[in-house]
């Protein structure tokens, strides 16, 4: 008997789920700006907890998501540590991607900005979470000229 399976990325701790309690966003009207009748919002805080807070009201309703996760370059910044073991980085991303998938509308699009360090792992993870057939394209941005390039 042939067993059917799927392609997936595995890492230490992948199936250890952290239980997140529902969260409530509290508006700070003193920081509001512009038309008060729009539904736009800026959320300041831990992004995992903020995403969890959005689940109740916005599941299946978000048309466009843009994320710029840590590149895991090995650097240490004041705001965050960009030097974590790859399995930890993948687990952090998996938790967020699963919530983003719930928030995304059927006709929605997600854009992820990464460098080469974790790009391929993120792509396989996203194939697993969003479905490989939902991938549209990868956009490469030239950030500097290669050695010997004319630049033209």
Label each region the model flagged.
Residues 86-140:
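Conserved Class I SAM-dependent methyltransferase catalytic core
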Residues 59, 79-84, 125-131, 152:
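Short secondary-structure boundary/capping segments
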Residues 17, 86, 120, 145-147:
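A generic structural micro-environment signature
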Residues 1-66, 73-87, 92-95:
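DnaQ-like (DEDDh/DEDDy) 3′-5′ exonuclease domain used for proofreading
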Residues 74-80, 122-124, 138, 150:
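Short, solvent-exposed loop/turn and secondary-structure capping segments
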Residues 136-152:
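Class I S-adenosyl-L-methionine
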Residues 1, 33-34, 102, 150-152:
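A general structural signal for short secondary-structure junctions and capping/turn motifs
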Residues 47-49, 71, 116-118, 142-145:
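Short, flexible loop/turn elements at secondary-structure junctions
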């Amino acid at each position: 008997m042939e067993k059917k399976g799927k392609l997936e990325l595995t890492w230490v701790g992948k199936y250890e789920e952290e239980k997140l309690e529902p969260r409530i966003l509290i508006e700070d009207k003193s920081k509001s700006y512009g038309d008060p009748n729009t539904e736009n919002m800026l959320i300041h805080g831990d992004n995992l907890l903020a995403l969890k807070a959005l689940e109740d009201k916005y599941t299946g309703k978000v048309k466009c998501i843009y994320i710029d996760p840590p590149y895991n370059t090995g650097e240490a910044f004041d705001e965050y540590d960009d030097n974590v073991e790859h399995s930890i980085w993948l687990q952090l991303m998996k938790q967020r991607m699963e919530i983003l998938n719930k928030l995304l509308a059927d006709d929605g699009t997600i854009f992820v900005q990464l460098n080469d360090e974790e790009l391929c792992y993120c792509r396989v993870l996203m194939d697993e979470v969003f479905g490989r057939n939902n991938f549209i394209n990868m956009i490469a941005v030239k950030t500097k000229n290669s050695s010997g390039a004319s630049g033209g």
